[in-house]
């Protein structure tokens, strides 16, 4: 039962009780109450000539006395109970003298027929509880149908897929709203063209792909691309989330898959879009419990519908996932998902186009340069950029500004990349520790060859960090050398080295730095073959989660001796980074103190101010950072700039 329906019933019941209370309490009681007495008491009052009138109703006698008479006394008090009207029951033995006594004492005698309930009324009394139960049940069913909508309701609606159908008029998103995904748009436009004009392809013997799988990290625009296809295609577009197939009853998932494809076939040519495919498409044969069996039944039905005995060339299936590694191999074979369209993070040119799309409805000032913003946000995907524009607009609205300026975008970027500024009260000693910690990161980042340029360093608490040193590469990186990675590790440990040099002890502020350095060293040794002792090997160590659909338990594909070697090599890499950080800090202690003093005074330093401080101490810095090589994309944006938290 829905909450609104329940409240309606409570209100109606409360109104009925209120009306009954008003009628019973506020209505004046003018009639004398009737008191039940014994037949002997009735005869006694009759003998005393105190009965004025009586009425016979079957075996019952109701009468009035001439004078009020005491009924009884309350023990222990002076209070008495009296009555004027009475009621009694005739005995089963006939009293032959009663009528003579009544006539002799001139008692007004009336006779009424005994009232018997109507058969219909009796039937209604017995049926009323059942009618109430049926009525409540009907309200419950109606409420569930209203709440769940099409495909919901009770038993009959569980087999409905619940997919929403979009037409060109209903979907307002087109490819013009999708920027930076030219390759993916080209792949999908070919499919849309096939549905619009199939003869163009069929005359050459070409067949449309049965399925298209959109693969990419979260936030890169996979679902947005599907919305654009719905807006561009001149055919019905059915959309559903894969999690909607699974229900509390066994067999519902397979039934909903059949219903979805039946609706698509009735409206062919059409497109089906299944979002988050990994919810039902995980590899079969693993997992425990009935829920896993239900998911496998749903997956089997999906496989059969996509490429079974019945052909459906005019129904194309699209899907999106960010976990293609856990999908069942049968889903990815030709004939089902023929094409896998990779939706990657955009480069700076694509980011500029995405910013243009998201700023269409935002009044921006003339000083806003979207190209500068795009270049200063490496690694950001479409969702991140949309959030960046929204944050800038919120900041401008908070300041009652008429337009969004470049300063608002800078504040929004700091909020997104470094976290929300916190009003945390810190002691002077803790501020000094934070300042030297961030100065250590900054000094390592500015003096280490090949390091990413400093964008901003702050000792204002943001997010969960007490201070942040932000580095941004000049351009997007797709290839990382060993020397660059070693520099990243050294920069991560620069804050810890500064604390040791100044305060001669370590603090807990380097917790996140140590984690970053260790994770990076582990990837260098285990995945990228950058260890001479381990060699050119790729070793899965602590990455795979066995319960994601691949295995029932984790196992190591290497010996205990190799595990010991890996630990030694990871420690060696981290120690090398620590040694490099210690050397740079030890050789530039005056510069470190100068940077820390500037941070304590100004709290936030940008790259220009950092370079000014370095020049004041006699260190010449290059304006143009070391160039980095281009090549294959290795880290997929994971190291494309970042913030070192103190």
Curated annotation (Swiss-Prot):
One of its GO terms (cellular component) is plasma membrane. Residues 1-4, 142-646 are cytoplasmic. Pfam families: AAA, AAA_lid_3, FtsH_ext, Peptidase_M41. It is an enzyme of class 3 (hydrolase). Its EC number is 3.4.24.-. The chain crosses the membrane at residues 5-25, 121-141. Keywords: ATP-binding, Cell inner membrane, Cell membrane, Hydrolase, Membrane, Metal-binding, Metalloprotease, Nucleotide-binding, Protease, Transmembrane, Transmembrane helix, Zinc. Zn(2+) binds at residues 437, 441, 513. One of its GO terms (biological process) is protein catabolic process. It is a multi-pass membrane protein. The active site is at 438. CDD domains: RecA-like_FtsH. Acts as a processive, ATP-dependent zinc metallopeptidase for both cytoplasmic and membrane proteins. Plays a role in the quality control of integral membrane proteins. Homohexamer. In the central section; belongs to the AAA ATPase family. In the C-terminal section; belongs to the peptidase M41 family. PANTHER family: ATP-DEPENDENT ZINC METALLOPROTEASE YME1L1, METALLOPROTEASE M41 FTSH. This is ATP-dependent zinc metalloprotease FtsH. It comes from Syntrophotalea carbinolica (strain DSM 2380 / NBRC 103641 / GraBd1).
């Amino acid at each position: 039962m829905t909450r609104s329906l329940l409240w309606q019933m409570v209100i109606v019941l409360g109104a009925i009780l209120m009306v009954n209370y008003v009628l019973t309490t506020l209505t004046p009681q003018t009639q004398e109450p009737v008191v039940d007495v014994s037949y002997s008491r009735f005869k006694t009052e009759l003998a005393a000539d105190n009965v004025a009138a009586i009425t016979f109703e079957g075996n019952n006698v109701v009468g009035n006395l001439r004078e009020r008479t005491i009924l009884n006394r309350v023990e222990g008090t002076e209070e008495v109970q009296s009555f004027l009207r009475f009621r009694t029951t005739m005995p089963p033995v006939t009293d032959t003298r009663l009528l003579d006594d009544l006539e002799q004492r001139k008692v007004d005698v009336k006779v009424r027929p005994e009232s018997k309930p109507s058969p219909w009324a009796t039937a209604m009394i017995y049926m009323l509880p059942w009618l109430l139960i049926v009525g409540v049940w009907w309200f419950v069913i109606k409420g569930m149908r209203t709440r769940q909508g099409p495909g919901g309701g009770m038993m009959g609606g569980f087999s409905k897929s619940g997919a929403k159908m979009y037409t060109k008029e209903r979907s307002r998103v087109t490819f013009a709203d999708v920027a930076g995904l030219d390759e993916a748009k080209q792949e999908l436009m070919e499919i849309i063209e096939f549905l619009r004009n199939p003869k163009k392809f069929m005359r050459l013997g070409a067949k449309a792909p049965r399925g298209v799988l959109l693969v990419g990290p979260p936030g890169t625009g996979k679902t947005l691309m599907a919305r654009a296809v719905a807006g561009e295609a001149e055919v019905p577009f059915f959309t559903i989330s894969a999690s909607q197939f699974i229900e509390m009853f066994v067999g519902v998932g397979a039934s909903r898959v059949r219903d979805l494809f039946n609706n698509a076939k009735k409206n062919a040519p059409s497109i089906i879009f299944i979002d988050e495919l990994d919810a039902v498409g995980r590899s079969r044969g693993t997992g425990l419990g009935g829920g896993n069996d239900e998911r496998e039944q749903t997956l089997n039905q999906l496989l059969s519908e996509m490429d079974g005995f019945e052909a459906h060339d005019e129904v194309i299936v699209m899907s999106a996932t960010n976990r293609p590694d856990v999908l069942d191999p049968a889903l990815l074979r030709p004939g089902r998902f023929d094409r896998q369209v990779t939706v990657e993070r955009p480069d700076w040119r694509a980011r500029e186009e995405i910013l243009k799309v998201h700023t269409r409805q935002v009044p921006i000032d003339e000083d806003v340069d979207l190209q500068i913003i795009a270049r200063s946000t490496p690694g950001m995907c479409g969702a991140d950029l949309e959030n960046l524009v929204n944050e800038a607009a919120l900041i401008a609205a908070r300041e009652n500004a008429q337009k969004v300026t470049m300063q608002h975008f800078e504040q929004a970027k700091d909020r997104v990349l470094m976290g929300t500024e916190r009003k945390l009260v810190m002691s002077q000693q803790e501020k000094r520790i934070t300042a030297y910690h961030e100065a250590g990161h900054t000094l390592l980042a500015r003096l280490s060859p090949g390091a990413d340029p400093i964008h901003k360093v702050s000792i204002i608490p943001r997010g969960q960090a007490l201070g942040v040193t932000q580095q941004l590469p000049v351009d997007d990186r797709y290839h990382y050398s060993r020397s660059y990675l070693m520099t990243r590790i050294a920069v991560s440990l620069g804050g810890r080295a500064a604390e040791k040099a100044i305060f001669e002890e370590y603090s807990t502020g380097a917790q996140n730095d140590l984690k970053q350095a260790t994770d990076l060293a582990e990837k260098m040794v285990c995945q990228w073959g950058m260890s001479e002792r381990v060699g050119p090997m790729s070793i899965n160590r602590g990455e795979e989660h066995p319960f994601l659909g691949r295995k029932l338990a984790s196992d190591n594909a290497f010996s205990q001796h190799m595990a010991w070697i890996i630990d030694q090599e990871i420690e060696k890499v981290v120690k090398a980074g620590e040694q490099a950080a210690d050397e740079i800090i030890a050789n530039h202690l005056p510069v470190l103190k100068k940077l820390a003093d500037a941070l304590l005074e100004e709290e936030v330093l940008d790259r220009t101010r950092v370079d000014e401080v370095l020049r004041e101490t006699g260190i010449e810095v290059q304006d143009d950072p070391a160039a980095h090589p281009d090549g294959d994309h290795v880290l997929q944006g994971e190291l494309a700039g970042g913030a070192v938290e103190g």
